[in-house]
Amino acid sequence: MKRVVFLFGLVIITSCTYNEISICDTDEPTYSDCVKPIIAANCLDCHSNGSAFGELLTYEELKWSIVDGDLIERIQMNENDAGFMPFQGEKLNESEIQILIKWKENGAKNN
């Protein structure tokens, strides 16, 4: 019986994995660690696979929306304003908005 418990414990311990969690540096936000997760959580339900105007699936699409488009302005609007994003969703928190602004100010790099 002790062997069975030992072997079971050994199997459990060796099957555990560790996934490194990406940390978002708010002074130097990166696309992969900071920007992409914000967009995935708040925008992709509508802005993917042709479900709404202005897809945001790729780096290029998102960069255009932030650098050349008006995405920053639209996420800063009041929730009742026409054009507010995310449409019928909760406003992004100030930290998320500042990360997107800082990413744009830093050149909107694909990193």
Regions found by a protein language model. Name each.
Residues 16-111:
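Aromatic- and Gly/Pro-enriched helix-to-coil junctions and flexible linker segments
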